[in-house]
Design a protein with these regions (language model features):
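Short, charged, surface-exposed secondary-structure boundary motifs
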Residues: 43-45, 61-63, 110-117, 158-159, ...
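ATP-dependent carboxylate activation and anion-phosphoryl transfer catalytic cores
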Residues: 72, 226-314
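Phosphate-binding site of ATP-dependent enzymes
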Residues: 160-240, 250-251, 255-257
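Active-site flanking residues adjacent to catalytic metal/cofactor-binding acidic residues
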Residues: 35, 148, 181, 247, ...
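ATP-binding N-terminal substructure of ATP-dependent carboxylate-amine bond-forming enzymes
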Residues: 1-103
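Active-site nucleotide/adenylate-binding loops and adjacent lid/helix of ATP-dependent enzymes
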Residues: 107-187, 197-202, 226
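Short, glycine/acidic-enriched loop or turn micro-motifs at the edges of active sites
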Residues: 39, 152, 263
Length: 314
């Protein structure tokens, strides 16, 4: 057991449920507490208790979170939504909150990943492969068709393809703070990459070629990480990375190009854990000053599939 009582936020979501299952299976904690903005979810089947919290942008969020920590004797917090991570970052609580550690990557990695324009600028400044990216209200797209996406928040939300100058003009009026981004092709060359750098400076990675279903990775196959290794090492260096992030890219005719960095655990975290890339457990161990052991990358071409599950609560 690494911790006694763990609080995982966003417990209605797929990532939090995956982390809860990993923690249970590994015997990493004695008790699991979850919290979310509503109670209509499967969390009670996986957590010992589920609490309600206001949305992260509401003024009472941190106060409510503190009450939960104290009431349940929580000794580690794992924030799962980017909105919550952003609030903890802004309040100076990335290292710890209410006297207990917060499990997260380093500050620079989080600041960069939360802002997709900052992601573009930092990686481009380090000579790493990125699609051209512009702020909608400041400059027109370099070419059409292109992607229109949020600057902050989940990249898949409100993402759309823009084909015409008429659509460009509408976006300039309605979404001036969002981003134009190069359309990366081919579509079937999309990869999600787990990237972990230990406190001792060891970099570990796993690359999965994925197929999306409903915005999530529905199926994936392990790819040889060798062609992506220089890029991923470069990202870890550019972010002075400590901890775990998720890198999303497409392999184009001009090489791999990164279109997003998620500064949190990935929705494929349980896929990866089963393949030996145990970034969640490594993060817990290192937060306690414990050794993480060796990592052996899985063989290419291993396939994995996300399956529906039935949960009864009552």
């Amino acid at each position: 057991m690494i911790y006694d009582t763990m609080l995982i936020t966003g417990c209605a979501g797929d990532i939090a449920l995956a982390l809860a299952r990993i923690a249970r299976e590994a015997g990493a904690v004695r008790r699991l507490i979850g919290c979310d903005v509503h109670a209509d979810h499967a969390g009670p089947a996986f957590f010992d208790a589920c609490e309600l919290v206001p949305r992260a942008n509401e003024g009472t969020y941190l106060e409510t979170l503190k009450r939960i920590v104290i009431a349940h004797g929580v000794d580690v917090i794992v924030p799962m939504s980017e909105a919550e991570i952003a609030v903890l970052l802004a309040a100076g609580h990335l290292g710890g909150f209410a006297g207990v550690p917060v499990l997260a990557a380093n500050r620079l990695a989080i600041e960069t990943g939360l802002d997709k324009y900052a992601t573009f600028n930092r990686l481009a400044a380090h000579g790493l492969g990125v699609p051209w990216t512009r702020i909608v209200g400041e400059a027109p797209p370099l070419a059409l068709p292109c992607i229109l996406k949020r600057r902050r928040g989940q990249g898949g939300k409100d993402l759309r393809l823009v084909y015409t100058e008429e659509e460009v003009e509408i976006a300039k009026q309605t979404r001036p703070d969002d981003l134009w981004q190069e359309l990366l092709l081919p579509e079937d060359q999309e990869y999600t990459c787990g990237l972990y750098r230990s406190r001792a400076g060891e970099t570990r990675m796993i690359v999965l070629r994925r197929r999306l279903q409903g915005g999530l990775t529905g199926a994936a196959v392990v790819a040889d990480s060798t062609p992506f290794s220089p890029l991923l090492h470069g990202i870890a260096d550019a972010l002075d990375l400590t901890g775990s992030i998720n890198v999303q890219l497409r392999l184009t005719a001009d090489g791999p190009k990164v279109f997003e960095i998620n500064p949190r655990f990935s929705s494929t975290v349980r896929f990866r854990d089963k393949l030996g890339f145990q970034d969640f457990i490594w993060s817990l161990l290192e937060s306690r000053g414990l050794a993480i052991g060796a990592y052996r990358a899985p063989s290419p071409d291993i396939r994995m599939y996300r399956c529906a599950d039935e949960v009864i609560i009552g």
